[in-house]
From Swiss-Prot:
One of its GO terms (molecular function) is zinc ion binding. InterPro entries: HypA/HybF (IPR000688). Keywords: Metal-binding, Nickel, Zinc. It comes from Methanococcus vannielii (strain ATCC 35089 / DSM 1224 / JCM 13029 / OCM 148 / SB). Involved in the maturation of [NiFe] hydrogenases. Required for nickel insertion into the metal center of the hydrogenase. It comes from the Archaea. The keyword Zinc applies. Belongs to the HypA/HybF family. This is Hydrogenase maturation factor HypA. One of its GO terms (biological process) is protein modification process. Ni(2+) binds at residue 2. It holds the Pfam family HypA. Zn(2+) binds at residues 78, 81, 97, 100.
Length: 124
């Protein structure tokens, strides 16, 4: 379950930002939302990621944070027929050109895992 390591990475990154904000004299009261970009080729189960995050964030300022995700589709270029487009990811992890069926392709993207932004709540 590699989702736990991803969830831990998210939590540690956000807690580091909260620590920085507090060192600037700001009173952080919580995090309400964390927005992620996740590539389809990471094969991360978003439901498992959310569950793992909820468990490890339980006693932190992130305990009420909602995780949102934007899934990033990989792009494919066929070296055989010149097709450029989106690669539809299946469980088989075959990278075939949807136009000619060739496996002589290049894949760009789809492996992203980024924290796009987070909504941090402060005490005025």
């Amino acid at each position: 379950m590699h989702e736990l390591s991803y969830a831990t990475s998210i939590l540690n990154s956000i807690l580091e930002v909260l620590k920085e904000q507090e060192s600037l004299g700001k009173k952080v009261t919580g995090v309400s939302e964390i927005n992620l970009e996740i590539g389809d080729l990471t094969l991360i189960s978003f439901e498992q990621l959310k569950f793992a995050f909820e468990v490890i964030a339980e006693n932190t300022l992130c305990k009420n944070a909602v995780l949102n995700t934007e899934m990033i589709k990989p792009k494919i270029s066929c070296l055989n027929c010149g097709f450029l487009g989106i690669l539809e990811v299946t469980d088989e992890l075959e990278a075939k050109c949807p136009k000619c069926g060739s496996m002589n392709v290049r894949i760009k993207g789809g492996k992203e895992f980024n924290i796009k932004n987070a909504i941090i709540e402060f005490d005025d």
